[in-house]
């Protein structure tokens, strides 16, 4: 998680999108985020929301996170679309109520793509059909879900980190991604070439980032991170990640790494 904390840190109230081609490690990444948050911020209530996932993936999440305190809520792909929608809306409603009670809540959900597909399949009458065969109305609830992330002025927060599936061969999946691209204040792109070479985390660092990161770093840390990005810019994702991982191994913490970087 050290790389993520540098490249695209997460703050309370964040709305983050993880852009994931197949087999790039998104499942493990979501599990690692949950574990890291619960280890370092025990006050946060973590909910893993799995929509239309394989039953074995749901079981893996529950077993992996069994002793962490994370709550796994799922509607696997052997359930009807109506069940996917019911679980999604119940989870969001409960998380919003908790945030209003001044609690900090994190929803990690997989995926925006399958959530939107579920709403598209449940529409009883057809509206305007977009390219890829998706009804424009299918985005209404997924947009509201993703947009619910915020830090409340009187205390409490709802952080939402969701995945969007790309490079699946489906035109509909690509349209769904394009609809949500740029709507978050954090985007993390996973890179297939890195995953194929078994280099993890498989982040495309130049395409990933957090908006208003100055709220999450000190002025000196931010300056060092900008220097780091400039040093890595122009390099291919594999080369950039290998270089960063090699440097991180030399220091025990990110604070120590940034202090040593750039003099």
Each model region followed by its residue ranges:
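P-loop NTPase catalytic core
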Residues: 16, 24-27, 31-263
């Amino acid at each position: 998680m050290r790389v993520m904390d540098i490249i695209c840190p997460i703050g309370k109230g964040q709305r983050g999108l993880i852009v994931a081609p197949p087999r790039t490690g998104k499942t493990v990444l979501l599990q690692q985020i949950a574990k890291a948050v619960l280890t370092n911020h025990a006050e946060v209530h973590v909910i893993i929301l799995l929509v239309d996932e394989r039953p074995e993936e749901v079981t893996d999440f529950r077993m992996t996170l069994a002793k962490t305190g994370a709550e796994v809520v799922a509607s696997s792909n052997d359930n009807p679309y109506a069940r996917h929608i019911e679980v999604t809306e119940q989870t969001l409603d409960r998380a919003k109520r908790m945030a209003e009670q001044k609690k900090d809540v994190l929803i990690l959900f997989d995926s925006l793509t399958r959530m939107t597909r579920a709403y598209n399949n449940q529409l009883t009458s057809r509206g305007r059909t977009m390219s890829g065969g998706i009804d424009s109305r299918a985005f209404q609830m997924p947009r509201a879900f993703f947009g619910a992330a915020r830090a409340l002025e009187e205390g409490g927060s709802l952080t939402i980190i969701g995945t969007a599936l790309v490079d699946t061969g489906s035109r509909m999946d690509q349209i769904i991604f394009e609809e949500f691209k740029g709507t978050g204040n954090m985007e993390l792109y996973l890179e297939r070439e890195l995953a194929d070479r078994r280099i993890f985390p498989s982040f495309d660092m130049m395409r990933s980032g957090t908006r208003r990161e100055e709220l999450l770093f000190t002025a000196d840390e931010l300056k060092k991170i900008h220097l780091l990005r400039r040093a890595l810019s122009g390099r291919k994702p594999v080369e950039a990640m290998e270089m960063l991982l090699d440097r991180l191994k030399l220091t025990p913490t990110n604070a120590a790494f940034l202090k040593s970087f750039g003099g």
